[in-house]
Amino acid sequence: MFSLHFIDEAFNEVYAGNGGHGIVAFRREKYVPFGGPAGGNGGNGGSVIFVGEQGETTLLKLKYQKHLKASHGFNGKNKSQNGANAPHLYVKVPLGTVFFTMDNHFLGEILHHQETLVIAKGGKGGRGNKALANFKNPAPSYAEKGDLGEHFKIKIQLKVLADVGLLGFPSVGKSSLISLISKAQPKIDSYPFTTLFPHLGVVLIDGFSFVIADLPGLIPNAHLGQGLGIQFLKHIERCRVLVHLISMQSLDPYKDYVALNKELQQYNSTLVEKKQIIVANKMDLPDAEKKLKDLQKKLSDVTIIPLSLINFYNIEKLKYAIKNLLQKTPFVIPKHDNFKVYDLNSETQTFTINKNKEGVFVVSGRQVEIFSHRTDFNNEAAVKRFNYLLKKIGIEEALKQKGAKLGDQVKICNYLFDFVI
């Protein structure tokens, strides 16, 4: 059951930890005149990882905890001691939580208990001079700085995970129905918008169980934000089956049916393709039979289940109808474009070179940024290695092809260099 503080959207800033720096050190022992390099590697920075938790029902904590920061990795030490990796920051979220960048680029979602999703990856620790030693340079006098951890803003949405969604305009009897067929105890009254947030209930029938959600009532133009609007329309996307309640107290039940489906269509056209069970509620009222017959004539190709919650009429029939339809309707995980996949060993070699208005050649690219962040520019040997790495991946030749000449300025990240052939 959700609390009065049900929050289904939050905006947060994630900070993964930076990698620790490798260090320059040499073995200093008596009777060992040429001990060689002994600088340890830096530890990896902590990542920001979200974890699905079945007991969580709201994003309330994230609503007020705007900044999610993981720790930095520890620096390496002498005597070949590596710095410790930083612990990851684990954040518990409800099942059905979806993550986006601020420009709505899909990052991932969590659907299962204890499922994890790395949103911001911690920086890799820099190598010490012992790890950088090779046959060409057996005693390097430089080390690598740790990589920066990822840092950006995200939008988090909770889309309720329920098998069945109860739909209808305000006061059609959704809350009363879910309280009768499950153990949910929503607030029930006769005024519109009694339900201000989704209520979940579990229905058991012949050893089969399903989760049903009482969603806040819709009104015309809900897809434009009228009433509770889009705030809760998104929860319908997860449901496999929709139970559409129509009140026989309405002046025109058919008009209500058409209007609600129009709202679904205008919000997301795929919603009207979901399996629906049409329920004519409040059959105990005068003229209900006449209105039901008129509705059946206009919806001749649709089975309508008449229902009276006061008289408990057809409640069991509805439960079995939902069960049978669910057994024929498999759960389909929504597809998202641009899914973010982490390759922990990926350091793409692509780069771009552009000449700005000031005549400066600007070099950008993921691997170039990594080289830059790992280099200690106060260390002459480290700068020489930086130049060697740029030449190795073809940047020097690419600059020549772009027309760079001796003495021209080249900008890499926040550093300006003079081009030397």
UniProtKB/Swiss-Prot annotation:
Q: Name one GO molecular function term.
A: magnesium ion binding
Any one Pfam family match given in the protein's UniProt record, by short name:
GTP1_OBG
| Cellular localization per UniProt | Cytoplasm
Residues annotated as domain OBG-type G: 162-327
Stated EC number for the protein is: 3.6.5.-
Give the keywords, sorted. Answer: Cytoplasm, GTP-binding, Hydrolase, Magnesium, Metal-binding, Nucleotide-binding
Q: Name one GO biological process term.
A: ribosome biogenesis
Among InterPro entries, the record links this protein to: G_OBG, GTP-bd, GTP-bd_Obg/CgtA, GTP-bd_prot_GTP1/OBG_C_sf, GTP1-OBG_CS, GTP1_OBG_dom, GTP1_OBG_dom_sf, OBG_GTPase
User: Where does the chain bind GTP?
Assistant: 168-175, 193-197, 214-217, 281-284, 308-310
Q: Report the enzyme's class at the first EC level.
A: hydrolase
Cofactor(s) named in the record: Mg(2+)
Superkingdom of source: Bacteria
Entry keyword annotation includes Nucleotide-binding: yes
Q: Which residues form the OCT domain?
A: 343-421
Which family does this protein fall into?
Belongs to the TRAFAC class OBG-HflX-like GTPase superfamily. OBG GTPase family.
Q: What does this protein do?
A: An essential GTPase which binds GTP, GDP and possibly (p)ppGpp with moderate affinity, with high nucleotide exchange rates and a fairly low GTP hydrolysis rate. Plays a role in control of the cell cycle, stress response, ribosome biogenesis and in those bacteria that undergo differentiation, in morphogenesis control.
Q: What is this protein called?
A: GTPase Obg
Organism this protein belongs to: Phytoplasma australiense
